[in-house]
């Protein structure tokens, strides 16, 4: 399946660009759905991660290795969590978070949000909202319920002393790039603290992209658990679940999680982000698209949703024809998740290209 009628075969990448099998170059504003955060073939990243391939790829979770120490040192420059569990994908990070919440609290109930997307494994899928992802796999994990996103009163009614955790995305990625409201996030934090429940911020898509390392930092709220994935390894499959409490050894685990290659990829990615100040600079690159069919532009930094009055499929295809690869987030939202190395000037070019395609449409 593809967004595009003509499915591209991508054969190589360099920086913010990719090339197809016919030699055509495209400005990549999808980045593997937010994964290639340093762009493609970043020379320093390729050098260091390539060297790791020649040194040590796996060691087994029962051993320590210097790459893990290097990664933890780099991570500590960004966040202040005491414990890190490493997996291989965003949905694994969410599964770990849900299990840890039940272990820590001794409770079963998980509260998630309408229109949320947390992954496709059974626990994460139970926290996900849309029926199209879930219906063929029911019954799912019991104990999950959903409340309306950004509804303070619904949160007050739902969160009780039977609640193990509340999980939310600071910016909902799959349902239209919808930011959480400040009052809502602070209410979630206050309520969970009051009843002894945990607050889980799913930052798999929003992490690193919004001008701060974690999007939840914009709200000046500290969650109990954070999940990270996608761009954290710049293409190497890896995810992190961050907590400030320990979990009994053996209660959860992964064969590949925390392997030397993944740890090196995270360490190098974080070091480049830090030295080039790419996370902070993302806040300067947000664009607001204008046009006759544009309702609004949502998001923060380089997590952008352009909301239109009509389905976006034809615009996505036209942009591809002009050499711009964009994604969707629902039927009426163009989603941009470009590499953080993209310049402000290039984002202005993207703005002009999208406006040109939208405003050039004279059909109803």
From Swiss-Prot:
Pathway(s): Amino-acid biosynthesis; L-lysine biosynthesis via AAA pathway; L-lysine from L-alpha-aminoadipate (Thermus route): step 4/5; Amino-acid biosynthesis; L-arginine biosynthesis
Modified residues (N6-(pyridoxal phosphate)lysine): 230
InterPro entries: AcOrn/SuccOrn_fam, Aminotrans_3, Aminotrans_3_PPA_site, Class-III_PLP-dep_AT, LysJ, PyrdxlP-dep_Trfase, PyrdxlP-dep_Trfase_major, PyrdxlP-dep_Trfase_small
Gene Ontology CC, one term: cytoplasm
EC number: 2.6.1.118, 2.6.1.124
Function: Involved in both the arginine and lysine biosynthetic pathways.
Name listed for the protein in its UniProt record: Putative [LysW]-aminoadipate semialdehyde/glutamate semialdehyde transaminase
């Amino acid at each position: 399946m593809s967004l595009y009628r003509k499915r591209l075969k991508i054969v190589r990448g360099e920086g913010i660009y990719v090339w197809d099998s016919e030699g055509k170059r495209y400005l990549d504003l999808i980045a593997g759905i937010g994964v290639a955060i340093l762009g493609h073939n970043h020379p320093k990243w390729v050098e260091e991660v390539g060297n790791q391939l020649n040194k040590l790829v796996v060691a087994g979770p029962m051993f320590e290795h210097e790459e893990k120490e290097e990664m933890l040192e780099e991570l500590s420059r960004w966040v202040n969590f005491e414990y890190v569990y490493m997996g291989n994908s965003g949905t694994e990070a969410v599964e770990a978070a849900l299990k840890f919440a039940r272990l820590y609290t001794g409770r079963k109930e998980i509260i998630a949000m309408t229109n949320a997307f947390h992954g496709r494994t059974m626990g994460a899928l139970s926290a996900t909202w849309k029926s199209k992802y879930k219906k063929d796999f029911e019954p799912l994990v019991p104990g999950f319920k959903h409340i309306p996103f950004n509804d303070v009163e619904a949160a007050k009614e739902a969160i009780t002393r039977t609640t193990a955790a509340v999980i939310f995305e600071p910016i909902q990625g799959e349902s239209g790039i919808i930011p959480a409201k400040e009052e809502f996030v602070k209410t979630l934090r206050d309520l969970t603290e009051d009843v002894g429940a945990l607050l889980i911020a799913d930052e798999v898509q929003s992490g690193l992209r919004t001008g701060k390392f974690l999007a939840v930092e914009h709200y000046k709220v500290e969650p109990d658990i954070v999940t990270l994935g996608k761009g954290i390894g710049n293409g190497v499959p890896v995810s992190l679940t961050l907590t400030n409490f320990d979990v009994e050894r053996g209660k959860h685990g992964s064969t590949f999680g925390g392997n030397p290659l993944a740890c090196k990829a995270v360490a190098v990615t974080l070091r480049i982000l830090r030295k080039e100040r790419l996370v902070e600079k993302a806040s300067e690159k947000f664009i607001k698209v204008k046009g006759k069919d544009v309702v609004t532009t949502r998001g923060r930094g380089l997590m952008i949703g352009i909301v239109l009055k009509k389905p976006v499929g034809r615009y996505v295809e036209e942009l591809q024809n002009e050499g711009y690869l964009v994604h969707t987030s629902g039927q009426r939202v163009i989603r941009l998740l470009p590499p953080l190395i993209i310049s402000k000037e290039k984002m202005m070019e993207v703005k002009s290209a999208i406006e040109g395609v939208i405003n050039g449409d004279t059909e109803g």
